């Protein structure tokens, strides 16, 4: 699954 980095 794709990984979305929201600055976490």
From Swiss-Prot:
The modification Leucine amide is found at residue 8. GO terms for cellular component: extracellular region. GO terms for biological process: neuropeptide signaling pathway. Keywords: Amidation, Neuropeptide, Secreted. It is found in: Secreted. The keyword Cytoplasm does not apply. Belongs to the allatostatin family. This is Cydiastatin-1. It comes from Cydia pomonella.
